[in-house]
Amino acid sequence: QGGDAISFVRWFGGKTFAEAVQVLLGQEGILLSETARPSPKPFLLPPRHTDMRRVYAYLLGRYIDREVIHFFAHRQLLYEDAVYHNAVFVGMDKNGVPRHAHKRGTVGGYKGNVSGSRPSYSFHWVGTDDTLYVFEAPVDVLSYITLHPENWPAHSYVALCGTSEQAAIWLLRQYPHLRTVVLCLDADKAGIEGGSRLR
């Protein structure tokens, strides 16, 4: 609905013409109530299943090397959730405390971050050399490692779990030895825009 400032104050504030003019001249204010923001949910990892059969079957079906799966599972960075049997990719802080979890359905296309996850800590591995490989999804990281297995633990990898650049920027700040960044994002609109933000 169009109109001038007086019309807006009359409509929005329920004022008469004279009252609206007073408001605009600074002689009266409109008290706006602040909308309550819901408090952020605490971050809780989904409960672990007693085994990882479905996650192994899913990832092996994606041609991920068994040793790569075992490597991340052994370090508590990958597990199967007890309720939905999703693959859960865990991102930890420098002290080994989980701060982020990304779920990938083992049946169907479900993907999502656990409520309360901090994007800066998404699924990653920090190696000793100076190269950081940046991906959109954790499965992309595992696929790349499977295709390029030579001395892979020496490199660093991060899955943005979307295209927010926060995780890559956090790693570069926390680990100054990382000097070379290789963007391995999808060639779609989201990947191209995410890559532009990282440049």
State where each predicted segment sits.
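Short, aromatic/basic amphipathic alpha-helical patches
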Residues: L171-Q174, E193-R199
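Secondary-structure boundary elements
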Residues: G61-V68, M92-V97
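Phosphate- and divalent-cation-binding pockets in alpha/beta enzyme and binding domains
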Residues: F8, S143-Y144, E193-R197
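Acidic beta-strand-to-loop metal/phosphate-binding motif
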Residues: V134, L178-A190
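Short, basic/aromatic recognition patches
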Residues: D65-A82
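Acidic, metal-coordinating catalytic cores used for nucleic-acid/nucleotide bond scission
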Residues: G162-Q166, L185-G195
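Non-catalytic accessory segments of DNA primases and related replication-initiation nucleases
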Residues: Q1-G61
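Phosphate-handling DNA/RNA-contact segment within nucleic-acid enzymes
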Residues: Y79-Q174
